[in-house]
């Protein structure tokens, strides 16, 4: 669970304008930021992500798909997003403020094996996270 003092984690809800969503995307790198939110919530046991406008993109997606978002209104915490498979590494953007309040390691999570691949002056710390036996579980329901 995310501590209360981690107030900078933000979801773009359906009530927010496309202009605001694109501004946030330009600042944080939308496909990195949203993928992090999905993985972080999955790995910390959330069962539902409501109207988060998440992008489920991988490094193999062509650039033309980089701006496509999938609006997710409900997902099991054991569900695996289409296009991300075991053994693949995904790059995630994590706000530096949030990085300070995340407990490492997260027990049973691939985030405990995350590698920081970029650091400030960017407002995000980019993490490369393996998706494997310890990520998204070995049993599908």
Swiss-Prot record:
This is Putative uncharacterized protein FLJ38264. It comes from Homo sapiens (Human). The lineage of its organism: Eukaryota, Metazoa, Chordata, Craniata, Vertebrata.
């Amino acid at each position: 669970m995310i501590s209360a003092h981690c107030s900078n984690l933000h979801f773009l809800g359906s009530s927010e304008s496309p202009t605001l969503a694109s501004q946030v995307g330009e600042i944080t790198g939308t496909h990195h930021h949203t993928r992090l939110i999905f993985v972080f919530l999955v790995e910390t046991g959330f069962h539902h992500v409501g109207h988060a406008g998440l992008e489920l993109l991988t490094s193999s997606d062509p650039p033309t798909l980089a701006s496509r978002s999938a609006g997710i209104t409900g997902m099991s915490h054991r569900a695996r997003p289409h296009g991300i498979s075991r053994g693949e590494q995904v790059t995630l953007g994590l706000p530096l403020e949030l990085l300070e309040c995340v407990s490492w390691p997260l027990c049973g999570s691939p985030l405990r094996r995350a590698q920081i691949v970029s650091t400030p002056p960017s407002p995000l710390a980019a993490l490369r996270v393996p998706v494997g036996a310890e990520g998204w579980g070995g049993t599908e329901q």
